[in-house]
């Protein structure tokens, strides 16, 4: 199994309503499996606040109701073990979609890491066997979105996941 770190830095989130298409740079990012047989297991989600004044922000990790299309960019997706063999189809990560931006589902929220981005942090770790999975190429199972629902906090952070 290959483990990856999907990262972003200095993203100022925009408060985007559910079932509304994102635009470039409005969210930390979108993690898309990209293949019917590729499964991602999310082990950790970390957000670190970078604002210079108090800014409570309600972040959401949710499934997509409309999946992104095209290459994802503006974000880093790095193999954490240099000796691991990367799968043939590597999942995509980024905050900008080449063709169609995703839409966050209004009913499939997974995590809600709300915190003050004036130096605050939010960290979620899965227990073994309780990882969040992303698999396939369809909405609701093939992609998750980390984004703000309320507030405009500036963050950097990462999502650790493994691919099987």
Task: Please provide the spans of the model-predicted regions.
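Beta-strand-centric surfaces of beta-sandwich/beta-rich domains
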Residues: 1-164
